[in-house]
Amino acid sequence: MCIAGKNIIFVAGLGGIGLDTNREIVKSGPKNLVILDRIENPAAIAELQAINPNVTVSFYPYDVTVALAESVKLLKTIFAKLKTVDLLVNGAGILDDHQIERTIAVNFTGTVNTTTAIMEFWDKRKGGPGGVIANICSVTGFNSIYQVPVYSASKAAALSFTSSLARLAPITGVTVYSINPGITDTTLVHKFNSWLDVEPRVAEKLLAFPTQTSLACAKNFVRAIEANKNGAIWKLDLNRLDEIEWTKHWDSGI
């Protein structure tokens, strides 16, 4: 996908990997970049606008845990303004295994609901034009960080959901791929809670191993957007972008 001239919605795009990715996206000249996030950050919005004044950067408050109908309502407002949307990035995520219900609600259910909501406008069975979705999952969807099993499971669920949607593209007209960052040096990983406090020093131990910067991850994120490969499972780790070949152990046959 050539980003230039496109209309993009980025969920949770004002911090960490999301903000750095949006810094790279605006350099490529989309027509509109719409950021949905829980907390407004006027300084970040102004910075993105200043990077490329030819891009219209806008913000709408959004919590991915709201009811599906609320997500549809917000997207209806955005589509009424932009007329078309080319790319949706689902980037909401938390890392705190003390918050079991919220971890699942944000990392998995929120992705499902926002995706389901945009199908109201994209699904070709309803006369929609189709579209592209990039879901930010995690390398923990491949192999868990066992001290945070809830987080790891939520990301594995998001990855499975994404892979299923890619298989449905001939029916819906919506193509989908997953973005799976490795351990990235952001505030998210500097302090977090393990499940039942099984490892109080989990963040410290994790950061003892090589990491990548959010900027390096962001640059590879944009490369994945440009590649625009339906069903791709992208690993963004240690400054590299690699497509993962998933090992099939079972097939429904349908």
Curated annotation (Swiss-Prot):
Residues recorded as binding NAD(+), renumbered to this chain, are 10-33
What Gene Ontology molecular-function terms does this entry list?
alcohol dehydrogenase (NAD+) activity
Residues the record lists as binding substrate: 138
Give the annotated active site. Answer: 151
Identify the keywords attached in UniProt to this record, alphabetized: NAD, Oxidoreductase
One GO cellular component term noted in the UniProt record for this chain = cytoplasm
Q: Which reaction does it catalyse?
A: a primary alcohol + NAD(+) = an aldehyde + NADH + H(+); a secondary alcohol + NAD(+) = a ketone + NADH + H(+)
- Example GO biological process: alcohol metabolic process
Q: Organism's domain of life?
A: Eukaryota
The signal peptide stretch is none
Supply the EC number(s): 1.1.1.1
The answer to whether the entry has keyword NAD is: yes
Family per UniProt?
Belongs to the short-chain dehydrogenases/reductases (SDR) family.
Q: Write down the PANTHER family for this protein, in alphabetical order.
A: 15-HYDROXYPROSTAGLANDIN DEHYDROGENASE [NAD(+)] (PTHR44229), ALCOHOL DEHYDROGENASE-RELATED (PTHR44229:SF8)
Q: By what name is this protein known? A: Alcohol dehydrogenase
Which species? Scaptomyza albovittata
